[in-house]
């Protein structure tokens, strides 16, 4: 939308506190067609890492304010995401961002869509030390323990957990036996695909190479491309 040459994100992601991640996405002038918007991989990522290592410290690099423009895309994102959700049901959501950046925006979006949302209080504020989890990946065993406890306390229908930069998501729901079932990424993707297909989605489904082939079978069942 902004016609940028590239998008760059500096993030701890779901890694240990001492690590920083650096992600680069290609813009339309660098790559067109299917490659536009993709994340850089090897060998370009290694070349960027070498350039970073060779650069001086940040406080030694002169900056030009003339080439910097702050752009807030949150309103556009919320509008578009709310359109995709459509009508909500009577659902209470426990939400955790694992001490990352997704809490406020996630709660605003889900509340706007008509859901009741309660943040896990101990993990609601951004904290680069991730004090309540040793490894803030919501897909890891044990990472959702605090969130599940909060979900039980408020009687939530579902727990949704983001990793610290909010590009990874996990979900868990209570079972009839009183325990909680945490969905794998493949299970979540299959459920979302089936949900969209049942609602009359058109176009093609796609998944990564490391994902289950189940989404492809769902697409074939509904006559959709994959």
Regions found by a protein language model. Give the residues of each.
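Generic beta-strand/beta-sheet core signal
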Residues: 7-11, 25-27, 94-98, 120-123, ...
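Ferredoxin-reductase
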Residues: 1-30, 216
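Extended, hydrophobic alpha-helical segments in both membrane/secreted and soluble proteins
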Residues: 103-106, 117, 143-148, 152-171, ...
């Amino acid at each position: 939308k902004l016609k940028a040459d590239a998008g760059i994100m500096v993030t701890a992601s779901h890694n240990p506190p001492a690590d920083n991640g650096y992600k680069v996405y290609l813009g339309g002038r660098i790559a067109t067609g299917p490659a536009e918007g993709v994340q850089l991989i090897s060998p370009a990522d290694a070349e960027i890492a070498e350039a970073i290592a060779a650069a001086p410290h940040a406080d030694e690099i002169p900056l030009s304010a003339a080439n910097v423009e702050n752009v807030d895309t949150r309103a556009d994102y919320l509008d578009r995401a709310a359109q995709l959700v459509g009508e909500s049901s009577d659902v209470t959501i426990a939400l955790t961002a694992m001490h990352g950046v997704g809490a406020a925006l996630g709660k605003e979006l889900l509340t706007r869509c008509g859901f009741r949302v309660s943040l896990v209080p101990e993990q609601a504020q951004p904290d680069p030390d991730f004090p309540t989890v040793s490894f803030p990946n919501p897909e890891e065993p044990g990472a959702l323990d605090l969130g599940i406890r909060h979900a039980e306390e408020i009687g939530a229908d579902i727990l949704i957990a983001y990793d610290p930069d909010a590009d990874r998501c996990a979900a868990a729901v209570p079972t009839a036996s009183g325990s909680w079932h945490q969905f794998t990424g493949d299970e979540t993707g299959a459920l979302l695909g089936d949900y969209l297909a049942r609602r009359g989605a058109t176009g093609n489904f796609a998944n990564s190479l490391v994902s289950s082939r189940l989404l492809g079978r769902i697409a074939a069942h509904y006559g959709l491309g994959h």
